[in-house]
């Protein structure tokens, strides 16, 4: 142990290097030398460095003596460094720019890629755009800068696009897109939202996410998922309805998430969405157009408000579109702002609402007032033309254009309402001498009760002369089959229709109702075969006409009360356009006046002989 101070003194002072071998001989035991060496070597080197930097020999000697006991350490350190430097060297080689003769080294692949794009590829704005790849011997030429920058990723070890399913990285987005298609049949895709496929789900949750079997559902024409009862996130839904992405975001912020998979519905929770299938937009738009066409026909006076038949034909197409019992199109078509989206349930599809602009035929206040007045006339016409017994709601009500509404043929009796044989046939009770099959009194095609079949089936209620159904019975008298009117003795010649007669003479003298214009001379057998084509109008149709008119009037009055109309058509035009049109009109008026003013004095004075349009030959003497 006495050699240690001598070694320290020799190292610190550096006066003489000879005492170094003597301590080496006086240390026969390896244990103290090994224990003292690591302790003295750092101290010696430290003291030597602090005391005098001009003695390299002493420092080297002390270093050699200190390394005698720690021989294996240097041998181990180079091996580890060589193993770790191999991949580092390979990585450094991949981060060298091989564009032409650049050979510049970079610390990361991102910096290398930006260097190539900015310095070597360049830009068109800086007039240094290069569309040919010069990486080693590539020489690939493109037509756009985006193409060459995408191609450069092949040479650069930059793989920013990572697959969320297998963790594999790719250099270009198109490579990742092709790779993702290989996972299309894997079960790992099931239960993953589009947001998760883009990297929205972290790795911890991805590891815990359960794997489910692919559902066998399908989307119907309204965009609703049908035919499966399995939910990826373990939340069963009602009615067997599948919802892939259920409650991933709070209900207070419904549309902060992507809108291609809405998780909640509007208008409250519905227990059965299959019964709430909104009509297609095209069908509802067509119904709105029918209602608008009706108002347009009224404005163009194409509907006669005093004719019940014209009113009925015009109102018939509106029975279904209006939907009086369900609050249909009339309320939705009125001008109103679009509905705001309100979320109430996360188990059912999105409710479909449509918003259409106001009708073009009902824009101004004058249009609404005229339409209300016209509908009032139509309502009075429908009310006055009711020929139905209100107490019985009889289905035998019929209004025919050829019969006066106050005639007995159009009035229903209690017998005809309760008789099973006379259903749909009005009770006709004329005398045998008042009707015949002569011209002018032939039964019209709209009267089914005058056919032989109807006469036989309704004998108790119709007092018509019947022909014998069995041979041997006497025929009725001629007086019962002929006409008793003296002014109707003229007979028609063959081939001449009833419509050939003058309607004025017939209206002045004939007390019986006029035949319809469509009716021709026909036999009773033809009437029995054809019968009533359109069928009698029922009480429900008449009542529906009244409801439609009242419904339209209520909507118009509501718009007038809330002043939901345009003040004037000119208010919808730009004032600058109106001023320019007024100036153009004034200029045209001035030009017309200037053209007329030179001609007025000429017309007042003597007219000058007009010059002939052809050459005049000289007169020969």
UniProtKB/Swiss-Prot annotation:
Key words of the record: Activator, Cytoplasm, DNA-binding, Metal-binding, Nucleus, Repeat, Repressor, Transcription, Transcription regulation, Zinc, Zinc-finger
UniProt short sequence motif YPX[LI] motif 1, positions renumbered to this chain: 464-467
Compositional bias of kind Polar residues: 1-14, 476-486, 515-525
Zinc finger (C2H2-type): 95-120, 131-155, 161-183
Localization (cell): Cytoplasm; Nucleus
PROSITE patterns: ZINC_FINGER_C2H2_1, ZINC_FINGER_C2H2_2
Post-translational changes noted in the entry: Activated by C-terminal proteolytic cleavage by signaling protease (probably palB/RIM13) at neutral to alkaline ambient pH.
Family membership noted in the UniProt record: Belongs to the pacC/RIM101 family.
Protein's job: Transcription factor that mediates regulation of both acid- and alkaline-expressed genes in response to ambient pH. At alkaline ambient pH, activates transcription of alkaline-expressed genes (including pacc-1 itself) and represses transcription of acid-expressed genes.
Subunit structure of this chain's protein: Binds to DNA. Interacts with palA/prr-1, which binds to the two YPX[LI] motifs and is required for proteolytic processing.
Protein name: pH-response transcription factor pacc-1
Organism per entry: Neurospora crassa (strain ATCC 24698 / 74-OR23-1A / CBS 708.71 / DSM 1257 / FGSC 987)
Lineage, broadest ranks: Eukaryota, Fungi, Dikarya, Ascomycota, Pezizomycotina
């Amino acid at each position: 142990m006495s050699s240690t101070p001598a070694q320290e003194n020799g190292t610190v002072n550096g006066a003489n290097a000879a005492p170094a071998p003597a301590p080496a001989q006086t240390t026969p035991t390896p244990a103290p030398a090994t224990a003292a060496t690591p302790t003295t070597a750092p101290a010696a080197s430290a003291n030597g460095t602090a005391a005098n930097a001009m003695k390299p020999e002493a420092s080297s000697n002390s270093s050699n003596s200190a390394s005698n006991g720690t021989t294996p350490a240097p041998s181990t350190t180079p091996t580890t460094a060589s193993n770790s430097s191999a991949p580092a060297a390979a990585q450094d080689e991949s981060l060298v720019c091989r564009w032409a003769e650049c050979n510049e080294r970079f610390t990361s692949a991102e910096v290398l890629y930006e260097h190539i794009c900015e310095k070597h590829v360049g830009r068109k704005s800086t007039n240094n755009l290069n569309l040919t790849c010069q990486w080693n011997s590539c020489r690939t030429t493109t037509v756009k800068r985006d193409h060459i920058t995408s191609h450069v990723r092949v040479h650069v070890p930059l793989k920013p696009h990572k697959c969320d399913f297998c963790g594999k990285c790719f250099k270009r987005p198109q490579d990742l897109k092709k790779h993702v298609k290989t996972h299309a049949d894997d079960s790992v895709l099931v239960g993953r939202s589009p947001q998760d496929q883009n990297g929205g789900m972290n790795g911890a949750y991805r590891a815990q996410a359960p794997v489910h079997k692919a559902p066998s559902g399908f989307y119907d024409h309204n965009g609703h998922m049908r035919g499966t009862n399995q939910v990826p996130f373990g939340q069963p839904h009602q009615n067997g309805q599948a919802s892939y992405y259920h409650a991933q975001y709070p209900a207070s912020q419904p549309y902060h998430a992507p809108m291609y998979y809405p998780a909640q519905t509007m208008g409250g929770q519905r227990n059965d969405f299959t019964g709430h299938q909104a009509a297609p937009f095209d069908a509802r738009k067509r119904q709105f157009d029918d209602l608008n066409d009706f108002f347009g026909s009224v404005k163009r006076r194409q509907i006669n408000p005093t004719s019940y038949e014209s009113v009925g034909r015009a109102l018939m197409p509106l029975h279904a579109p209006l939907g009086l019992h369900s609050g249909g199109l009339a309320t939705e078509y009125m001008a109103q702002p679009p509905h705001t989206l309100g979320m109430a349930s996360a188990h059912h599809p999105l409710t479909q609402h449509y918003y259409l602009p106001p009708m073009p035929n009902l824009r101004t206040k004058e249009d609404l007032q005229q339409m209300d007045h016209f509908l009032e006339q139509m309502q009075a016409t429908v009310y006055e033309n009711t020929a139905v017994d209100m107490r019985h709601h009889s289905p035998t009500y019929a209004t025919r254009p050829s019969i006066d509404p106050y005639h007995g043929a159009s009035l229903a009796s209690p017998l005809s309402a309760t008789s099973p044989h006379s259903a749909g046939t009005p009770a006709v009770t004329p005398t045998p001498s008042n009707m015949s099959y002569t011209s002018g009194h032939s039964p019209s095609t709209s009267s089914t009760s005058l056919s032989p079949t109807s006469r036989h089936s309704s004998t108790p209620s119709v007092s018509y002369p019947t022909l014998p159904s069995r041979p041997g019975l006497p025929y009725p008298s001629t007086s019962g089959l002929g006409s008793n009117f003296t002014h109707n003795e003229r007979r028609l010649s063959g081939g001449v229709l009833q419509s050939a007669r003058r309607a004025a003479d017939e209206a002045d003298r004939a007390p019986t109702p006029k035949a319809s214009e469509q009716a021709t001379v026909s036999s009773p057998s033809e009437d029995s075969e054809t019968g009533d084509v359109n069928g009698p109008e029922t009480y429900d149709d008449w009542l529906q006409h009244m409801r439609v008119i009242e419904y339209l009037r209520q909507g118009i009055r509501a718009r007038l009360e809330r002043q939901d109309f345009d003040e004037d058509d000119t208010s919808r035009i730009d004032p600058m356009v109106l001023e320019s049109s007024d100036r153009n009109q004034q200029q045209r008026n001035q030009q017309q006046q200037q053209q007329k003013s030179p001609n007025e004095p000429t017309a007042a004075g003597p007219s000058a002989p007009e010059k002939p349009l052809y050459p005049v030959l000289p007169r020969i003497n």
